[in-house]
């Protein structure tokens, strides 16, 4: 199984997953720019696409999203330097482009997706509490009996 030859469980119905990452924010504590966490996007993206699922990336407002610096495997801190999945995603132009033009959460049609996954990072702690459109979509997935998952600081949507 690979990205080129996915093992599709049901060829007539590809499962579809919406992954939501945060728009850029500024920490009210440190005053530093914060964003989504690379591995909380890239690892689920890799797992789902390897299983043959179609994955689309969204953000509350749409547009370009920025990752937290320390989540970048190339960051001088070395904090995430062993994250080869994120490095591969970042180094692949087609994949890296997915975070430069995200669609807004408002455009998610719950009936056309099987799951929603909300990635974490530091920005969700400063932006998801007021992302009422994201709250509504997440609740709609849950109400429809679909998978609704929030990773790490992505649980800030529950505040």
Q: What are the language-model segments listed below?
A:
Residues 1-144, 157-159:
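Extended, subdomain-level signal for the structured scaffold at the beginning of enzyme domains
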Residues 153-155:
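Rossmann-fold NAD(P)-binding glycine/threonine-rich loop
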């Amino acid at each position: 199984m690979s990205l080129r030859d996915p093992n599709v469980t049901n060829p007539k119905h590809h499962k579809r997953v919406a992954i939501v990452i945060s728009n850029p924010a500024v920490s009210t504590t440190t005053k530093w720019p914060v964003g989504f966490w690379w591995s909380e996007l890239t690892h689920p993206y890799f797992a789902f696409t390897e299983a043959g699922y179609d994955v689309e990336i969204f953000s509350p407002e749409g547009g370009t999203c920025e990752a937290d610096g320390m989540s970048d495997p190339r960051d001088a801190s070395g904090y995430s330097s062993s994250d080869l999945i994120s490095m591969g995603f970042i180094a692949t132009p087609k994949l890296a482009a997915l975070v430069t033009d995200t669609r807004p959460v408002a455009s998610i049609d719950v009936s056309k997706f099987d799951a929603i996954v909300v990635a974490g990072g530091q920005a969700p702690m400063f932006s998801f509490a007021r992302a009422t459109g994201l709250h509504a979509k997440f609740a709609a997935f849950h109400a429809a009996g679909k998978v609704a998952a929030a990773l790490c600081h992505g649980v800030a949507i529950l505040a």
